[in-house]
C-alpha cells in the first residue's frame, strides 16, 4: 500500500513540474505611432505563433481579434476607448494586459 502511495506521489509531482515548466509570456508596448505591438511565447522556449489575441473594451466587448504572427507578435491600432489585451495561450494560459499599463 505504501509503495503505491509513493508511486502516485511521484507521478503527481512529475505532472506538477511539467505543468509549471510551460508558462505563457506576453508583453505589449506602444509604438508611438498610434499602434500597439504585443510579443509572446512560453517559458519553455516555445513560440506563440498562431496564439489567439483579442482587444476588448472595458465592458468586455471584442474590438479587435487576431493571432500572433510567425514572429510571435501582434500589432494593432490603438483603440480610442479604454481597453485590455488578451493572450489566449490554451490550457489555462490566459494573460490580460490593461491598456493603461502599456508604455512606449
Where are the regions that the model predicts?
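Glycine-centered loop-to-beta-strand initiation motif
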Residues: 67-76
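Short amphipathic beta-strand segments in non-cytosolic proteins
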Residues: 52-65
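Short, aromatic- and glycine-rich surface loops/edge beta-strands on solvent-exposed regions
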Residues: 81-93
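Short solvent-exposed capping/turn motifs at the termini of beta-strands
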Residues: 40-44
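Sec-dependent N-terminal signal peptides
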Residues: 5-13
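Short beta-strand/loop motifs in extracellular/secreted proteins, especially
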Residues: 49-51, 83
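Beta-strand-rich domain onsets/edges
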Residues: 19-37, 59, 98-103
